[in-house]
């Protein structure tokens, strides 16, 4: 008959660590086997002849290089027919994402022995088959680098053993759980991890479709970050997110998470967080998160945070976290947001001690926070102190100013709740505000300010100089009077340029205010100039300090309600070049622009 050579398969795939493959060959002739080309270096075969139905064995050497392909030729003895077998051996470097759902798939991936994954490694430990539940990552002990994300979802593991060789995660490291991760106490098993290129996030997750659990406990034994002693850099965000109470698809879900976490021990070598640092707790008095967290002190080498620094606990405070000391932190490029129980009016004072901080993106204080940053000279964006929430802002605004005494530059708005302010002297080094300078006061608050002394070095306000904005601000109707001891603008003596000027005065506010003294050096207003007064007893009678004002560039120049003001001649120089709408009414005298320019500016 016709000679026949029929291998059971034309292509064989092998793992990078090598091993043996068997080829089932059906034949009716004698044959020889030839391993072609460079494949001789990594494919060997002890048997070269057989008859009829044979099993050919080949030994595959370990592959420490790129993926490779070899060919084996089987030739009949008279060379009348031949068959080619292709052997494809994977590299220890896997190209593409790996998604693991359950233990069977985990064992299969572990058997391949990958050292590097050029993609994401996504592991969902829990599925509906409890026998296929992942309880250990031991089989992944060959992986040294993941050039994508590492996502661990809902795992019942006791530790991270199996990831002991992992040195770098190029993307995000995300650990998320719905009623799981309750056996880990630390990060033991990640001892060699020195860099996370993206985010490092641990979080409660929302339920998937079909998951019915409404009361969830996550990370319930985690005490610290031991095991991450070699981690030096997180390129993205570092976030711990506890949901507490959450409504999802019209159903309530409750979480108690991170309640044994006491410290950040284990992260002593972390120097850089490229994104934001955030601890988020949305629990209430029954479903609490971060119950024992009392310190961030183990972040002893952290020098830079590229995004925001945020403690977010709007409903129920993280009660043990009273003092945060980060002595090596020099730079926060984003904002400091401190919201520890402020919606509920909690009065747990947080002391934020950043003694070597030199650069800050911005600061919004809406909680009982004392910021000690005596080396901080520059804030690139906004500085908000106790704004819009007088019950929490007024109690510590003065203490916050005291801790910012080296500030020379605020890039955008500077907004201050003045309810608790007695002196602006700590701002004596301030030279520049790029946005608005806004003074607020609570509608049921009073203050003891005597003057604006403290702003003597301020020369430029890029935005407006504002008093009386919003409902809880100077100018609100209340049983108290706001800024009742202020008589003039003394303190702004070197101010030469502002982006606009606005005073909105209601009944009883600025009750002793009589003159614009202190603004003698003001030369330029790049926007509108408006004064609106609703108090017929208001005492402003002297604007002679505006004699040197050269230009007002806005579309509106308005003075209303200054019943004692009768002399507008100091505005003559500014009105000479003014192109907008000028109006005066309900004053002691109400001249037009033309009257002032013609020498009739005084009654």
What is the meaning of each model-derived region?
Residues 1-11, 81-98:
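Bacterial Sec-dependent N-terminal signal peptides
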Residues 4-7, 26-57:
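Surface-exposed binding patches on compact interaction domains or structured appendages
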Residues 12-18:
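Short, solvent-exposed loop/linker segments at the N-terminal edge
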Residues 98-103, 120-135, 145-158, 170-185, ...:
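Concave beta-strand-loop units of leucine-rich repeat
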